[in-house]
Amino acid sequence: MIDFDILLEAYFDCRRHKRKTVGATEFEMNYMSNLVQLLDEVNSRQYKIGKSICFVVKYPRYREVFAGQFRDRILHHYIALRLEQLFESQFSDRTYNCRKGKGQLAGIRQLQRDIREVSENYTKDAHVMGIDLKGFFMSIHKPLLAKMVDGFIVENYHGDDKEDLRWLCNMVVMHHPEKDCEKKSADYLWEFLPKEKSLFTNGEDKGVAIGNLFAQLFANFLLSKLDWKINYYCKHHVRYVDDMVLVARRKETLLRLMPMIRETLASLGLRLNEKKFYFQHYSKGVRFVGAIIKRDRIYSVNNTVNNYRKSVRNLNGAAKTGNLEHIEKCTQSVNSYLGIFSHYNEYGMKRKIIKEELDKESWQYFTVKGHFQSIHLRKKFDTDIKYKNMANEVLNRKIEDRNDVPNESEISRLLDSGYELEIYATQNGRIRIEGFPPS
């Protein structure tokens, strides 16, 4: 039987950063009863996965995403809590996605160290080979993955909920969300997706839904077999999801690995994306997970720089609207890029773009902190905009709700007499209207 305390912990993990969503709010209104019901359903084998929502994202490329109901996602977190540490003991240190203490930046830094080590501090030749998998998540064979996960649990897991965990993992892996889902995107958007990139058209028992927590966890587990085989022949390599880069002194060392890599992937029902294969000297630069790694320098790829430029431009429009929520959203977008660039050698670029794209009128609203580390709304404008938004919110209410606003006939009389009116909100949220006589 599954453990209620772990299920409760999974619930708290699941709602983190999601408390304002509709599903999380509805579940939280009576969360203890809902958790007990979910517990009983799993332990009695009556649990059924609910309807998912499905949509297509257009950036950075068209991609199909499925999102399960909140109660289903709680069980995904339950699975992660029970298996993640066991999986960690099986993973290679060269796997960097969705792992504590790892991540995208850590993978980039490791690859930079590998190149420096193999080239003996850039004094010798070194070559890099980049490989990518074709339609990775959509190519995963469900029965094979379910069998591998079940075998791992049988051999390595010894908790009291072992049988329940096996049943639950098999259910989520073999689930077909495309057969019971609500589309949130227009149908024509699916026309931009190749058939092998959609669960609706890529074939029976193929593909796991991008958007569910277990997809990343189980995908790492699936590719751990390839990681260890590569590690046996080439210890200088890094993998982030399906993006891999290998480093070696001699070209032949890397090229001899290709048959083994293809054979291992074929045994997992996967294959290489031949269009994304590259092989070159390290001095030409190495592209990996959004970064260009060169000797002693790391730059962002052009797509990231262009998106940063667009986010700065959006600040101009936000400042003109005076909408605080819009301004904060645009500011957060710019700061997210500045945060990324702070780890790279990009000071000149981020400074140049802000100076080029932020117009003079907008500059009065914002201040830049540090060496272009972040941008913030000036405090005096922050307060002014809040009061302005409060006034607009009240004035846009129905007339009967505006008890604290002077009579409209009085306002009309003052205007007809040539008075200038100033409408503003006080700190306690009340609306004040002051009239200034004609000069």
Q: Where do the model's predicted regions map?
A:
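Conserved polymerase palm-domain catalytic core
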Residues: 114, 120-241, 246-258, 262, ...
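Short, conserved non-catalytic motifs in the polymerase core
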Residues: 17-25, 50-74, 90-102, 176, ...
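Amphipathic alpha-helical blocks
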Residues: 28-51
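Non-catalytic, polymerase-adjacent accessory regions of viral genome-replication enzymes
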Residues: 1-36, 381-395
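Short linear proline/tyrosine/threonine-rich motifs used for host-factor recruitment
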Residues: 422-425, 431-435
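Right-hand nucleic-acid polymerase module
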Residues: 68-69, 77, 189, 194-205, ...
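Active-site-proximal segment of RNA-dependent polymerases
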Residues: 80-141
